[in-house]
Amino acid sequence: MTEQLAAYSTSTGEAVQFWVLGTIAVIGALCTVFMRRAVHSALCLAGTMIVLAVFYLANGAYFLGIVQIVVYTGAIMMLFLFVVMLVGVTAADSLKETIKGQRWLALLCGLGFGTLLITGIGHASLGEFNGIGQANANGNVEGIASLIFTRYVFAFEITGILLITAAVGAMVLTHRERTERARTQRELAEQRVREGKYLPPLPAPGVYARHNAVDIAGLLPDGTPSELTVSKTLRERGQIRDVSQEALNDLRALEQRAEERLERTAVEPTFKSAYERSEEASK
Amino acid sequence: MNPVNYLYLAALLFTIGATGVLIRRNAIVVFMCIELMLNACNLAFVAFSRMHGNLDGQIIAFFTMVVAAAEVVVGLAIIVSLFRSRHSASVDDASLMKL
């Protein structure tokens, strides 16, 4: 009886590993289903797959464990993340139900299916437990290789054909033929003139020499800031910095000091008038 | 611990994946749930391989992985081309087969 039990159970270490990592795997799977954003789902699924790789290693499937990490978490999940980035990370699933009560029915179906599967396993007579030790005696990779290239050689060849077909299929599906001719630079310029858009290059940002940062609007001759000088992206993000009066006053103080040191008396009239007018405008 | 527990875990993961396919409407997440189901099957295969003491289960799991890789490549290409034509990855919007 005890011998049978010993053959039937695994070591305590593996049991602890199973219960700890199994919980993580189930939580990861649940998060995959219930996270609203696709990126979070993908990351949770990657975690579950790594846990499964550890289980493969614990079950003596060393080759599959490594392949799981390299192919699944390394290649497939990264491909998923690439597509999520293409489609848009911020696009969260809408929570509006299109079919009434579909979510609860789906949960009910899932529950029923799970109960069916688990009671099925519980009733099956799984008396046989041989352990993988003997099969792995000559090495796991060698054992798999000798089986693949003898008994499963046709399946292996067909898998190769499948992979080639999939690669060609993906290229055909994502390749897009250009239907119209790309417009030349001359045509684009003529169109711009016809539409009456702003033709010359846009004015540079920055206020005098102290603020040539791109997020500060340049001043027009009358001292008012011009929105046109700041890049469109910054304008749409609302990241334009104000030309504060304090900075202007600083600048004026600096110039006055410079003038005193240089012992200049007359101030250039254009500068002076620009300051005064900007002050008036701000008031 | 009885190694049959691995089968229970596989059944649980498969069920979660199947429920996800029914609940979610984002095509990418549905696809991820399918991957989860495939992985659960692989775990069951590996556990069976250990129970029976031969490597056939592991080889089937290996073939499953190759087929899953091919499936992901084609499936994601379909999702990308759907997104290009409809600007949405929701399975509700793709009610017609034509693009």
UniProtKB/Swiss-Prot annotation, chain B:
GO terms for cellular component: NADH dehydrogenase complex; plasma membrane. Pfam families: Oxidored_q2. Its main location: membrane. It is found in: Cell membrane. The chain crosses the membrane at residues 3-23, 28-48, 59-79. It is a multi-pass membrane protein. InterPro entries: NADH_UbQ_OxRdtase_chain4L/K, NUOK/Mnh_C1-like. One of its GO terms (molecular function) is NADH:ubiquinone reductase (non-electrogenic) activity. PANTHER family: NADH DEHYDROGENASE SUBUNIT 4L-RELATED, NADH-UBIQUINONE OXIDOREDUCTASE SUBUNIT ND4L. NDH-1 shuttles electrons from NADH, via FMN and iron-sulfur (Fe-S) centers, to quinones in the respiratory chain. The immediate electron acceptor for the enzyme in this species is believed to be a menaquinone. Couples the redox reaction to proton translocation (for every two electrons transferred, four hydrogen ions are translocated across the cytoplasmic membrane), and thus conserves the redox energy in a proton gradient. This is NADH-quinone oxidoreductase subunit K 2. It comes from Streptomyces coelicolor (strain ATCC BAA-471 / A3(2) / M145). The lineage of its organism: Bacteria, Bacillati, Actinomycetota, Actinomycetes, Kitasatosporales. The gene is nuoK2.
